[in-house]
A protein has these predicted regions:
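GST-like domain detector, emphasizing the conserved glutathione-binding G-site
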Residues: 1-129
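Short, contiguous strand/loop micro-motifs
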Residues: 5-7, 158, 175-176, 200-201
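Tryptophan-centric aromatic hotspots in well-structured domains and transmembrane helices
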Residues: 15, 20, 70, 89, ...
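A generic structural-conservation signal
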Residues: 32, 183, 201-202
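Phosphate-coordinating loops and pocket residues in cytosolic domains that bind phosphorylated ligands
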Residues: 52, 194, 203
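GST-like fold's C-terminal all-alpha helical module
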Residues: 106-194
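Terminal-tail/helix-coil boundary detector
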Residues: 202-209
Length: 209
């Protein structure tokens, strides 16, 4: 059977966006199923429709025959292996290592950014940030600048990779909350936001009820 990716509402679920982009960029055919988040069990991993397909009670989750992968990064890594060498991770070992480190930092960190700049593709507003969020933004911009400088751009590791998929929702948050990236990073942010697959995701998100 074709891989089936269960995701949350496209307007809100940044964790669903990340592996969805990886699958699209890897040119891996898959079916998507949107499971609306909210209502009974929301926030506790107990939404009945999600529990029915995900052992963790969370989305995204990928089903491939009898394989069930319930984590955004694990799904992206599955996509990289399916796509083959040099597609979603670079061939250079140093680029892969630093790309995975950056991706894991996003996967596990930047908590203040995620709390204070919640993902909502239908919103546009500015708001004050805590010192912690400001410090995380500074770290984020340093990370991006360092990778772009080391590998020459135009993507973080030179060519487009899972690392870019994991930071695309952050770029959308910058736009949502009117946060201007440093001048040397504006081109990278614009590249993320101009990606055709992201635009397709956003179009579907804004059409959600």
């Amino acid at each position: 059977m074709r891989p089936r990716l269960y995701i949350g509402n496209k307007r809100y679920s940044s964790w669903s966006m990340r592996p969805w982009l990886a699958l699209r960029w890897g040119q891996i055919g898959f079916d998507e199923v949107v499971v609306p988040l909210g209502g009974e069990g929301y926030g506790s991993g107990a939404i009945p429709a999600v529990r029915a397909v995900s052992p963790t009670g969370q989305v995204p989750v990928l089903h491939v025959d009898d394989l069930v992968v319930a984590d955004s990064l694990a799904i992206a890594e599955w996509a990289a292996e399916r796509a083959g060498p040099g597609v979603l991770w670079p061939v250079r070992s140093d680029a892969r290592a630093l790309g995975r480190a950056a991706t894991c930092e996003m996967h596990a960190g930047f908590g203040a950014i995620r709390r204070e700049l919640s993902h909502n593709l239908g919103r546009r507003l500015a708001r004050p940030l805590s010192d912690r969020a400001d410090a995380e933004l500074a770290r984020l911009f340093d990370l991006w600048a360092g990778l772009l400088d080391r590998f020459g751009g135009p993507w973080l590791l030179g060519a487009r990779s899972i690392a870019d998929a994991f930071y695309t929702p952050v770029a959308s948050r910058l736009r949502t909350y009117a946060i201007r990236a440093p001048a040397q990073l504006v081109g990278y942010v614009d590249r993320l936001l101009g990606d055709p697959d992201l635009r397709a995701w956003e179009e579907a998100a804004l059409a959600e009820p």
